[in-house]
Amino acid sequence: RDGWICLEGPGGKEQQVHMNDDWYRLVQLALPQNGTYRIRYKGVGLIQMYLSGGPDLMERGIRFLDPDSGDEMELGKWYDTSVREQYHFNPFMNWVNDPNGLCWFKGYYHLFYQSNPFGQEWNDMYWGHAVSRDLLHWTHMPYVLEPQPGLWRDKEHKGGAFSGSAQVEGEQMHLYLTRHHGPQEDGEETREWQTEAVCRDGIHVEKERPCITERPEGASFDFRDPKVQRAEGRDYMVLGSSLDGVPSILLYVREGGRWLFKGPLLQEHEPGIRTF
């Protein structure tokens, strides 16, 4: 089927996005300020809709809109229910799991998290984002990482932006994460690799690139969740995996811009465990 979304702006200017056979997809449309807009759609369902950008976004946060009416949603009423966690962070709606990239950068604590914006179950993974000045009051930010584009229309495979960490270096935040692609049931066709991305303004992520694409000899297809730490002037990374059938934390060190495998840092010999 041919579903579409059309944004009509000042002067009747239109932006159209055709969805075709895409199953789930995050669509971004540019809105110049100080205009009136109308959104039309057919053959698709809008699950979440928000406004982002503009000045002071770190303080204001994004503005969630009702997909049917276009009205701004009042978060106080949305969160003030007996089934909502009131102390710890939770997203606006739908699935959340692993927290990632926890760091302090340019005056804010940053929390990234694995998310499925489209439903209340695990699916292809996005990275959501929130910021805080005190670790109690959180401001919602735009999603920063999406699944690989081919997964939008592929029901036979799963993947996306899996867990990772952050390292702040001066005016840049470096995000390290695992990209996953494989069949619905994990196995030897499953592929996981590590990437690095840069964030300069605390909002937008750019220049994501692979940094470790091949597993060391003997490592299983479970090869994920990079944690990067600097010690004595050198950058180290640990990854969860299994080495020759033994659950292992793999140690890497950065040398000359490349990550080199040094061996297992810790192993678990208790039977019945698949991976760290």
Give residue spans per PLM region.
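Beta-rich carbohydrate-recognition and catalytic domains
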Residues: 1-225, 229-276
